[in-house]
Amino acid sequence: MKVVSALTAVERLLEQGRVRPGDTLLDSSSGIYAYALALACHKYGLGCHIVGSTTIDSTLYNQLVLLGCRLEQVELSADLKLDQSLRVRRVRQLLAENPHYHWMRQYHDDIHCLGYRPIADRIRAELGGEALTIVGGVGSGASTGALARYLRDAGTDVGLVGVQPFGSITFGAEHVSDSEMIIAGIGSSIPFGNVEHTAYDTLHWISFDTALSASTDLLRRHAVFAGLSSGAAYLAARWERHVRSSGPVLFIAADTGHRYNEAVFSRAESARDIAELAPHSAVDTTELTMPWSRMRWDRAEAPPNARSEEEREAMPVKWSR
């Protein structure tokens, strides 16, 4: 999924002259954005420097290295917020040492939204402008937020449903912890500037074990080998289809299942029948509870902890057209 985002962002930077062939692009990522940025840099003759964690598996590691990416892996700590902060600190050190580097800032620069315009156009063309519901992991906010924004700007009635892991600060669930792990890519322990909270109508919070069951079902039932974030979105989309009276429900499958082979698919025997699962209905974030909660967000503003000091001082999120 991130390929369209990273590739279009790099193309725009080159068009604007903000980077030139031979320059180095830098960011923090331990997943599919790292791979997407490495592909874009490889295509356009740019250097790629990624600060990731030790959770990067051997398959991704080998791909990044062979694509010419310089990869630094920061050791994990017991605290996810500290992990993310350490990686950002290392990025800032690298920028100080290499002022000619360009920091992509995938979580804060809305240039990453541009690549989703053609996808929004395709959705609108295939559905003929019919009202629809989009379901997907929130993460950096670029994919779900941009698709909804571009479709709404074109006159399509879009209900936007975001999917989050427990423990994520983005929509105020940092007080509920998942004993297994936070699902990579769809939540965060630090604020993200690209998340436009007022775009979302409904939120689902889904635990690791529940997403495991959904990812397993997605493969068994539909032959789609996708990751945990895709499984979580699939589960939420099934529920939204159940409670909504009309209109198609489209969900975003962000990544393949390869990196989850050991953590998820080798544990398929522990998967529950998702037909037996239903979300707890929460009125506000104080009522969130494991393993699955659903709440109306009604396009409300960001919760207090989801905006950093840097964010509050910066300009509001602006969407590139």
Where do the protein language model's features map onto the residues?
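Active-site/ligand-binding loops adjacent to catalytic centers
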Residues: 88, 153-228, 264-321
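Alpha-helix C-terminal capping segments
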Residues: 11-18, 35-47, 65-66, 148-154, ...
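A short, small-residue-rich loop immediately preceding and capping a beta-strand
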Residues: 20-53, 131-144
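Buried hydrophobic positions in well-ordered alpha/beta secondary-structure cores of metabolic enzymes
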Residues: 31, 41, 64, 104, ...
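Small/polar-residue-rich loop-to-helix segments that shape phosphate-bearing ligand pockets
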Residues: 54-133, 165-212, 296-297
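Catalytic phosphate/nucleotide-handling subdomain of diverse soluble enzymes
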Residues: 238-274, 281
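Helix-rich "cap/lid" substructures immediately adjacent to catalytic or cofactor-binding pockets
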Residues: 1-23
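Glycine-rich ThDP/TPP pyrophosphate-binding loop and its adjacent helix/strand module
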Residues: 115-159
